[in-house]
Amino acid sequence: MQKKLFCFGLGYTARALISHVAGEDDWTIAGTCRSPDKRDKFARQGIECHLFDGSIPLRNIVDALSGVTHMLISTPPGESRGDPVLACHGNDLSRLTNLHWIGYLSTTGVYGDHDGGWVDDETPETPTSRRGELRLAAERDWLMLAESASLPVHLFRLGSIYGPGRGQQEGLKSGRTKKIVKPNQYFSRIHVEDIVQVLLASMAHPDPGQSYNVVDDLPAPPDQVIDYVCDLMSLPRLPDVDFETADLSPLMRSFYSESKRVRNDRIKSELGVKLKHPTYREGFAALVK
């Protein structure tokens, strides 16, 4: 069967997924980006790319979505219009008849703050940040469209993403990283290769309407991870910076307002995923070797 993947948003995770399927004869790839320069770059890589910034619909949407069998959504929701793909093209998507799989990339932020406690795939969503509220609203809008139009939507709640060119190893190289210390602060992480594993497993075994926590096996305090990566890179450990007095942007401070440890049982029990990088230790060791 000929398959066509369309990615609304050709960011870090989408490009990683594309790199795994682009070389296969039965896949064609298309997607959207926000600038002509990026469009031209993707075109040189053989990716059919359309300009879309979420403010106005694609003029050639029928042609763009012709033959699409799989769709990945990684565009973030906005304050005024919610999910930009649904706002601009919800009706167009509802008329597609050949879609086998839709993946919506969300965030574990929909669970809110749990004071360092555990959450799992069944934990009720209780976002405590505006960012989490917008993501949860977008998730629900996608599921509503899925129900009304019988679309195979799947939700992927991602932890903090790292991988080649992205993560603590890059911040340490550039000198941007600060070791913020806050008691009982936990973040869950996921290597981009394992996100791709999960997406491919879901494509192979669709379960429309299902949600998955996409994180590794070991949530950890951010300062602990920074120390570990410093040691791997043979760098001196950074000085502790107390969260209460740290000079942080409002966005960064908002991340530290939530602490939880996220379980990943469903990607293993239902999709059969065996993580390549089960903890940050294996993941960063592979990146800096």
Give the label of every model feature segment.
Residues 205-252:
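Mid/C-terminal beta-alpha module of Rossmann-like enzyme folds, strongest
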Residues 14-15:
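N-terminal Rossmann-fold NAD(P) dinucleotide-binding loop
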Residues 143-187:
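NAD(P)-dependent short-chain dehydrogenase/reductase
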Residues 90-130:
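Conserved Rossmann-fold NAD(P)-dependent oxidoreductase catalytic core, especially the SDR/UDP-sugar
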Residues 61-104:
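NAD(P)-cofactor binding segment of oxidoreductase domains
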Residues 136, 149-151, 161-172, 201-212, ...:
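Glycine/proline-rich active-site loop of Rossmann-fold NAD(P)-dependent oxidoreductases
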Residues 52-56, 254-289:
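C-terminal amphipathic/interface module of NAD(P)-dependent oxidoreductases
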Residues 115-155:
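Catalytic helix-loop patch of NAD(P)-dependent Rossmann-fold dehydrogenases
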